[in-house]
Amino acid sequence: MREISVPAPFTVGEHDNVAAMVFEHERDDPDYVIYQRLIDGVWTDVTCAEAANQIRAAALGLISLGVQAGDRVVIFSATRYEWAILDFAILAVGAVTVPTYETSSAEQVRWVLQDSEAVVLFAETDSHATMVAELSGSVPALREVLQIAGSGPNALDRLTEAGASVDPAELTARLAALRSTDPATLIYTSGTTGRPKGCQLTQSNLVHEIKGARAYHPTLLRKGERLLVFLPLAHVLARAISMAAFHSKVTVGFTSDIKNLLPMLAVFKPTVVVSVPRVFEKVYNTAEQNAANAGKGRIFAIAAQTAVDWSEACDRGGPGLLLRAKHAVFDRLVYRKLRAALGGNCRAAVSGGAPLGARLGHFYRGAGLTIYEGYGLSGTSGGVAISQFNDLKIGTVGKPVPGNSLRIADDGELLVRGGVVFSGYWRNEQATTEAFTDGWFKTGDLGAVDEDGFLTITGRKKEIIVTAGGKNVAPAVLEDQLRAHPLISQAVVVGDAKPFIGALITIDPEAFEGWKQRNSKTAGASVGDLATDPDLIAEIDAAVKQANLAVSHAESIRKFRILPVDFTEDTGELTPTMKVKRKVVAEKFASDIEAIYNKE
């Protein structure tokens, strides 16, 4: 199958907009707890009425600052409660939210401010505000910087005070004037070359995403469910899901404290989480490693295989009596503990940003946590395809979100069009023209649609490796297999214009400590110290051989190199959503890549 379309069971009217639901909830269900926010370490209830009052006050404050419809307003902050409130306030006055990662460099922030000509910026911390102050001479359009946290008055208080003299009828008029075709957000996304491009999404794009998500997941997105958002809200996935949750009256909490995520989950007790595959891989690998360190590695291995077998059997008519009995035993011994680590009430998750892998998907479903995998880009307002609660095929990213169509081009590239697809790049007609063909958005991803209409993503078009022998290799297949090993943190497949495929491997710091202990290595030895250790080489070689089973001989990894350091966002090799920056890795570790191909 080359094309599939799913009609929308809803409509988006001329005046439909994102902010409208804030005041609809206030009118229809004022006392319902729509948010919980952290105040001095305690999750504190925020009702629909309280949230609407804060959003209204912030919106009036923006009006008092002279923010006009269509003006760009930057949020330069990590995920937190205030982020969502400010976002709704910006949208309510008809302005355009420009999200910026809290880890952005000064040069990145400068470009966003210059290109968007933003008039107001919300800075999270003192250091963020200081960075922006140092840029003031080069961003003439910026009139106001308000600080969300840190020293001095906070942004919400300042906006409330400033807006106190504004007639609320001003906001009512702004809301009434909103059109679904109006711009809502400008998301800067890096291209293959040059500076980041501003991806323009309209109110209609976001409303289509919100309603489409609800149509596919009425049992996850419904009143009474609980969602903890810990991915960056600057990323379209987290923002779109949190908006969809708000629309469906899911109680939402926010945190960016990833180091203390497990204690947060234990207290918040979400019923659903949204994450990227690397987090699910890490949870699995940590559980496997902890079992090995406790001398229970074999028990965990059998439990993991039982979970996979049970899930696969569910797709074939259901597990038999013996498998059900084994599954019940391991549910008490293993799976229940895994679910407890996520707060005890979590029964489903949404994964996006990269392929999850069929084995991991089957494991989690077998362990009692179904992961609904989706696919999307900034240009598709978040998800353009997602697995459904009642129509799931593990290993795929599901079918189009209602109101959208998918097509596979002759060269395998995935093309999309529909309600969630963006209108173009900000002030960049050339890039917009290049991004579309006959009205279809060229995603840059390679995919396939099976006979049942399920989409599988096989890799990025620009990441395809062409060896010296002319073999095309999609690195994601091998890399996903390698990261499944508990000792491996990241893997980057190389080999463009080279005689064979190679790989750079980084070691998981936590797993490494347990491995050293089990293999009687010096406690203080670093990965660099043991990079050529025969036992470590043998362990990674076994993982490489296992990964190679997923590809042909010509695509298999012939040699690998263990790097002395892991990739991190701080050192520049990972994006905020934990994707590897291949170009950065290739430049930083050029000598290691060359060493793979040096004749010995």
From Swiss-Prot:
InterPro entries given in the database record: AMP-bd_C_sf, AMP-binding_CS, AMP-dep_synth/lig_dom, ANL_N_sf
Catalytic activity reported: a long-chain fatty acid + ATP + CoA = a long-chain fatty acyl-CoA + AMP + diphosphate; dodecanoate + ATP + CoA = dodecanoyl-CoA + AMP + diphosphate; hexadecanoate + ATP + CoA = hexadecanoyl-CoA + AMP + diphosphate
Pfam families named among the record's database cross-references: AMP-binding, AMP-binding_C_3
UniProt pathway: Lipid metabolism; fatty acid biosynthesis
GO biological process, one term: fatty acid biosynthetic process
MF (Gene Ontology): ATP binding; CoA-ligase activity; long-chain fatty acid-CoA ligase activity
Keyword Plastid belongs to the record: no
Keywords from the UniProt entry: ATP-binding, Fatty acid metabolism, Ligase, Lipid metabolism, Nucleotide-binding
Protein name listed in UniProt: Long-chain-fatty-acid--CoA ligase FadD15
Organism field: Mycobacterium tuberculosis (strain ATCC 25618 / H37Rv)
